[in-house]
């Protein structure tokens, strides 16, 4: 679940020697194919001289942008070879430039929708914890005077005794929070993963 929960995780797996990869060798596994859909990035280390750089890149990719799991596959001959223990100072990966800048047009549109709504409601997920945005989320809801509900992963972002906090939603949530979602005319989802489970066709 590290991918869905945006958990920065670096995994190391063992592999047969590089000259045996792709030959259906005993104990060989197509780890790239197995993990492609559940990992943020998968790297097969082919040369010992690339190992330190790739380890540095793996940790960088795992914790930047949308955090997630990264896997390094280490062939037997690469692990057996001696090499330098120095790591590069900086990481520069061509084609990987996480966008962390806010989109001012989208922010303005969201603010207009909030001001026009009669019963707006914030739904905050665990991404707020990962981003370290607890203080900012509390300040935003207090400034706008908009109530908040959370997902299970988002529990703890808002103090449970806060007057604007209704609790967490869903099957394991409470009645007040679930009813608030049903009654709101604008649901502002922040930093969460939306489930593909079937929903009530009467809702929009």
Q: Model segments located where?
A:
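Alpha-helix C-terminal capping segments
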Residues: 1-9, 143, 183
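Glycine-rich beta-alpha junction loops
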Residues: 16, 74-80, 126-128, 155
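Active-site-proximal loop->helix
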Residues: 17-37, 160-165
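Conserved thiamine diphosphate
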Residues: 26-65, 183-184
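Conformationally flexible catalytic loops at phosphate/diphosphate-handling active centers
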Residues: 61-116
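Anionic-ligand anchoring segments at beta-strand to alpha-helix junctions in alpha/beta enzyme folds, i.e.
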Residues: 116-183
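Conserved small/polar residues in nucleotide/adenosyl-binding loops
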Residues: 193-198
